[in-house]
Amino acid sequence: VLVLMGALAWWMRAPWPRTALEWLHIGVSGVLVHGVYLGGVFIAIGHGLPAGVTAIVVGLQPVLTALGAGLLLGERVRPTQWAGLALGFVGVAMVVAHKVAASASGGMLLTMLLPALVALLAITAGTLYQKRFCHSFDLRTGSVIQLLPCLVVTGLAAYQFETLHVQWTGSFVFAMGWLVLVLSLGAVSLL
């Protein structure tokens, strides 16, 4: 994603932030939103927390962000917005309720849940941080700036905690293609 977004930014001559402070703020928001959030989600699932339970935990992000926006940014959340957030959360809960029940009956451990909670706090903090300190930036160059420190952070974490051995199976290649092309580039293009 980093290479593709960098090439796109260069090819389209996208504007880059002018000050080191802008780069720093965009980088910090990127580490929180991309590195810590996604890392926490994948670690939680890797430790055995079902994807549905992980989804319900990080599905609280809009609610926490709305609370934080009111408390930290002085934004007012209207009652209709709270109702929409509540309906969305209820919808997610209904879809994954059976998985939550199965995990709880199987003895859900804090070690499984903790990375998902860290991911929730990271995506919330990153969203609020970006709203507060990254007022406007080009999505092409901003994505590059957000992903550069993530490469360093996740690279160091992988070096420390992983085997660095990749099994190049068809399933792995398809999953990586989906994560890179559809989820990452697709999500950025929707912004």
Where are these regions (language model features)?
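Specific transmembrane alpha-helical segments of multi-pass solute transporters/efflux pumps
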Residues: W10-V58, M94, V180-L191
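Specific alpha-helical transmembrane segments that line the substrate/conduction pathway
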Residues: V1-V3, V33, F42-R76, Q81, ...
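Helix-helix packing/entry segments at the starts of transmembrane helices
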Residues: L38, V53-L60, T127-V152, V180-L191
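Hydrophobic transmembrane alpha-helices of multi-pass small-molecule transport proteins
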Residues: L2-M5, G68, V77-K99, L120-I123, ...
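Membrane-interface helix termini and inter-helical loops of multi-pass transporters
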Residues: P15-W16, I43-H47, V96-L109, A158-A175
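Hydrophobic residues within alpha-helical transmembrane segments
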Residues: L24, V28, L32, L60, ...
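Loop-to-transmembrane alpha-helix entry segments
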Residues: T19-L21, H25, A55, G74-M94, ...
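Transmembrane alpha-helices of multi-pass small-molecule transport proteins
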Residues: V1-V36, L64, L121-G126, S143-E162, ...
